[in-house]
Amino acid sequence: MTHSEHDEELANAIMALATPELPQYFSSLVKCLAAFDNLIIIAYHGEHRPAVLYREYTDPVVYLPMDSQYLGGAYLLDPFYREHLRGSVQGIRRLMDVAPDHFRRTHYYKNYYQQTTLLDEVAVFASITESVTLTACLGRDCSSGKPFNKRELQALRQYGMTLSSLLKKHWQDYRSDNVMKAAPAPVEERLREALNQQHSIRLSPRQAEVALFILRGHSSLSISLHLGVSLQTVKVFRRQLYAKCCISSQAELFALLMPLFARLTEHG
């Protein structure tokens, strides 16, 4: 990429603001910085179900599970969704930099993420309002067979705020279909209700919180740091959780809870 090529693509993207062509010009601009195999722009609104605004791909298999699985509830375990919930996130985030320490061991990673053939993913975050975040996620999948290199990641980070600003300006008037809906209850509360209705298992708020930490890929040490309690206390929470659910392993916890996730988004 030369400076003149980048400047030309940036000028094209600026001229395309507030037109339907912006996503394509945005894509061309990003490709000057880092070649990618797929791009998807997603709008997150609070804890409601997210909306896909744009997608492009080399191999369609990468988005085959998107509508049924990701939007059907798997997004609740996505590290990028968790970043959105932090609020006011701008700039570049690499998935593996924000994912929990045991992310690759999770049901989400093994049964959803690997199915997409994604090898690496970087997101441009743009905070539109207090509750709405846009992410432009660019990925490398089996089409290229390799992750982003150091030079590409450096280029993306260098222009991260420019890319965020383009997204924010273009979608500044974006209104989610959920804007008139009441905010859903916290996901821990929804999980407790679904588990009680489906299996007559009554978790305490803390047990539900720990269960979700485990599903997202947090180790016991990571959970202790997030909750501000000792590692031994987390181990006690896990034993209580497993006993109440009549299970003895993390795999059984995934098998019990993952089918409930579609129910958690019914009112999202």
Language model: regions and residue ranges:
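Short alpha-helical interdomain "coupling" segment at the junction between an upstream regulatory sensor module
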Residues: 167-185
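Regulatory hinge/linker segments at domain boundaries
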Residues: 181-206
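Pre-recognition alpha-helix immediately N-terminal to the DNA-recognition helix
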Residues: 208-209, 252
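Short helix-to-turn junction characteristic of helix-turn-helix DNA-binding domains
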Residues: 214-218, 257
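Recognition helix of helix-turn-helix DNA-binding domains
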Residues: 217-252
